[in-house]
Amino acid sequence: MAAKEVKFGRSAREKMLKGVDILADAVKVTLGPKGRNVVIDKSFGAPRITKDGVSVAKEIELEDKFENMGAQLVREVASKTNDIAGDGTTTATVLAQAIVREGAKAVAAGMNPMDLKRGIDLAVAEVVKDLQAKAKKINTSEEVAQVGTISANGERQIGLDIAEAMQRVGNEGVITVEEAKTAETELEVVEGMQFDRGYLSPYFVTNPEKMVADLEDAYILLHEKKLSNLQAMLPVLEAVVQTGKPLVIIAEDVEGEALATLVVNKLRGGLKIAAVKAPGFGDRRKAMLEDIAILTGGTVISEDLGIKLESVTLDMLGKSKKVSISKENTTIVDGAGQKSDIEGRVAQIKAQIEETTSDYDREKLQERLAKLAGGVAVIRVGGSTEVEVKEKKDRIDDALNATRAAVQEGIVPGGGVALLRSSTKITVKGVNDDQEAGINIVRKALQSLVRQIAENAGDEASIVVGKILDKNEDNYGYNAQTGEYGDLIALGIVDPVKVVRTALQNAASVASLLITTEAMIAELPKKESAMPQMPGGGMGGMDF
C-alpha cells in the first residue's frame, strides 16, 4: 500500500479552500448575461469555447491532491445540480464557494462546525419554503420563451424555438438537440407517433415522387409474430376490402407468400395496403406494439392473449386518420384511441421512469412517453464553425432543461434577486450563537449571486445590492444586460424555482460537509526514480 499524507484542522481546510476557489473562480466568470467565455484545451481538435458551468468544472483537475479534493467536491455540486435540474450549475458553484468561505472563517474563529452546519440547514430549509411560496406558474408560450432566452444567455431566438417546440409536442414531448450541417438553426417537428421502421417492399409506395406510402383513414393490424401464411390472413383482408379502406400491417415480419400476395393485390389495385416491421426488439417490441394499439384503439394479436389471426374482426383493428410510411420511418397521425386509455398508459410509463435505475431504459421509456403524449421535436443547431455549433448546442441544452424545470415548479424573479429577497425573510432562530452564525452564513451567501452578476457586468456589486434592497418589492431587481432596474418578471428575467432550489440545496449540502472536515488523507506523489545508467558499449580493454 502506498504511503499517505495526512493533514489536520486549519492547514487541511486552507488547502481545500484553495481548491474550491480555483474551480469556483473559473466557473463564476460565466455567470449572467455579461458572463465571459472559458476556453478549454482539448488533446485533439480545436479548443472548446463554452459558457456552461458544468463543462468548465468537469475539466478542472489540480496537481496538489488536497486542493484537488476541495475542487472535486464543488465539481460534484455542479454535476448533481445539472443531473437534477439540467441548469444552474454556475449558481450552485458560486453559492457553495460563498458558504465554504464564510464557514471556514467561522471555524477558524473557534465556532463549533456541527452547530454551524445545523444553522446552515435550518436557514436553507426556510429559504426553500419561501421560494416555493413565491413561485409563479408558467401558463403562456411567451413565459416559456423568456425562461429559454435567459438560460441561453439572452439569445431570444433560442427561447422562441424552445417555446414553439414545447407548444407543438406538449410539455411531455421529446425535444432533442442535434448539430446541423448548415449555418442556420432550425426546428423540425414530427407530430403523431413515429418509429424507425419503413415499408417492407417498395411496391407499397403510393407517391413514387417522394417514395412514401400515404394511407388516409386506415385500419391497422398489429401482430406480435411473423406472418408468412396467407390462409390465416384471408378473413381479415376480405373484411377490410368490403369497407373500402386501406390497411396497414405492423408485425414482427411479413414474408413468403403472405408478402407476395399483398404486393400483387396492391399492384392490381384491389387492395390499398402496406406492411411494416414492428419497432424495437424483445420485450420492448411487445410494449411498443401495445402503445400503438392504445393510440389507435386496436388490439395486439398475440398468442399470449389467445387471439388467433383467423378469428380477428374489424373492431380489433386500430384506426388512424393518416399513416405515412417512408423507406426508414412510419408515422401514425391522429389515432382513434380513447383519451382515457392513452392517459392511463402515459401514467404507467411515467411510473416506470421513476422506478428504473438504468439510464438507457429511462431514455427509451421517455421516447415512448413522448410518442404517446404528442410527438418529437428536433432543434438542429447551425453555425459557421464546429466550435460555434458546439458552444451554441451547450446553451440550447441548458435552456431546454431550464424551461422544463420552469414548467414543473414555476418561476421566480431572475438575476439572483429571488435568493437576495429570501435572505431578508429568514426568521428562524438557532438554539445557540454558533447555529445563529450558520444562519448568518446563508444570509450572506444568498447575496453572492447578485454580486457576481453585477461584477461580471462591470458594475459595483455593493451599490447594486443596496439599490435592490431599498425597494420592498419582490420582483424589483437589476437587469445586468441594460444596467437598469425594474420589475424583473415583466422584463422577462426569470429563473425556474427547481433550478434555484436544487442549486442552493446541493451547494449547502457539500459546503457544510467541507466546513465540518477536520482531517484529509491523500496518497504521497510517487518519486520518479532516475534512469539507470546504460552499461558501457564495446568490450573492455580492447583497442580498435
Swiss-Prot record:
GO terms for molecular function: ATP binding; ATP-dependent protein folding chaperone; isomerase activity; unfolded protein binding. Its EC number is 5.6.1.7. It comes from the Bacteria. The keyword Nucleotide-binding applies. One of its GO terms (biological process) is protein refolding. The keyword Zinc does not apply. It catalyses: ATP + H2O + a folded polypeptide = ADP + phosphate + an unfolded polypeptide. Its main location: cytoplasm. Keywords: ATP-binding, Chaperone, Cytoplasm, Isomerase, Nucleotide-binding. ATP binds at T30, L31, G32, P33, K51, D87, G88, T89, T90, T91, G415, D495. SUPFAM superfamilies: GroEL apical domain-like, GroEL equatorial domain-like, GroEL-intermediate domain like. It is found in: Cytoplasm. GO terms for cellular component: cytoplasm. Pfam families: Cpn60_TCP1. InterPro entries: Chaperonin_Cpn60_CS, Cpn60/GroEL, Cpn60/GroEL/TCP-1, GroEL-like_apical_dom_sf, GROEL-like_equatorial_sf, TCP-1-like_intermed_sf. Belongs to the chaperonin (HSP60) family. Forms a cylinder of 14 subunits composed of two heptameric rings stacked back-to-back. Interacts with the co-chaperonin GroES. Together with its co-chaperonin GroES, plays an essential role in assisting protein folding. The GroEL-GroES system forms a nano-cage that allows encapsulation of the non-native substrate proteins and provides a physical environment optimized to promote and accelerate protein folding. This is Chaperonin GroEL.
